[in-house]
């Protein structure tokens, strides 16, 4: 049975363009995979706390198997999010570009799932840290929208794109390298072009849904 975890990162919820595009994809995916399992995780409306000092102390406790109960409680949500990620074969992330990066809820989610001993390991080699990704066999679709244009590959503002490019880096760090990005651009800078861009993005998403 195919399984998809959808991470919704916009604080605008259903009014978000990236969310609407992702929903169109997910609807098409469900139609193509009637026996598939879809799980949704809302992180864009303040539902997910950012990591705290207590979280950091617990996550990097030198003896993870001997964490006090209080530390285990500090990591309970993170443990749940990691387990949720590992339990699904496919991941769909809807995340608009906010000030050249991702919404803070997406950053919080990444901070919770990039976990030493769970999604990556590290060891010293001649005093230099070597990282080992632990997540295997996952495939990711990033659905994004951008107020301006030219932020995609080869665009004039590509170097300013720290949104989906950063997500690729973070996911690759834990072992997820099969990543596809579908973007709609120009909501604020070129409304007429944006409508066309959304249409093109949706057509691409509907095609991707058949084999995701």
Curated annotation (Swiss-Prot):
It is an enzyme of class 1 (oxidoreductase). Coiled coil: none annotated. Its EC number is 1.6.5.-, 1.7.1.17. Keywords: Flavoprotein, FMN, NAD, Oxidoreductase. FMN binds at residues 10, 16-18, 145-148. InterPro entries: Flavodoxin_fold, Flavoprotein-like_sf, FMN-dep_NADH:Q_OxRdtase_AzoR1, NADH:quinone_OxRdtase_FMN_depd. It catalyses: 2 a quinone + NADH + H(+) = 2 a 1,4-benzosemiquinone + NAD(+); N,N-dimethyl-1,4-phenylenediamine + anthranilate + 2 NAD(+) = 2-(4-dimethylaminophenyl)diazenylbenzoate + 2 NADH + 2 H(+). Its cofactor is FMN. Binds 1 FMN per subunit. Quinone reductase that provides resistance to thiol-specific stress caused by electrophilic quinones. HAMAP family: Azoreductase_type1. Homodimer. This is FMN-dependent NADH:quinone oxidoreductase 1.
């Amino acid at each position: 049975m195919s399984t998809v975890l959808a991470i919704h990162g916009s604080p605008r919820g259903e009014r978000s363009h990236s969310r609407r595009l992702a929903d169109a994809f997910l609807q098409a995916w469900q139609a193509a995979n009637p026996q598939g399992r879809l799980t949704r995780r809302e992180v864009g409306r303040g539902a997910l706390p950012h990591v705290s000092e207590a979280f950091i102390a617990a996550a990097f406790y030198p003896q993870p198997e001997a964490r006090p109960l209080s530390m285990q409680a500090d990591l309970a949500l993170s443990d749940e999010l990691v387990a949720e990620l590992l339990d699904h074969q496919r991941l769909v992330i809807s995340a608009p570009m906010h000030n050249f990066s991702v919404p803070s809820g997406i950053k919080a989610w990444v901070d919770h799932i990039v976990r030493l001993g769970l999604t990556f390991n590290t060891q010293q080699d001649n005093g230099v840290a070597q990282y080992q990704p632990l997540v295997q066999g996952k495939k990711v679709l990033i659905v994004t929208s951008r107020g301006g244009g030219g932020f995609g590959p080869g665009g004039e503002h590509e170097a300013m794109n720290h949104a989906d490019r950063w997500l690729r880096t973070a996911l690759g760090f834990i072992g997820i390298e099969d990543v596809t990005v579908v973007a709609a651009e120009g909501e604020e800078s070129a409304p007429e072009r944006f409508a066309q861009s959304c249409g093109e993005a949706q057509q691409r998403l509907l095609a991707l849904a058949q084999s995701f």
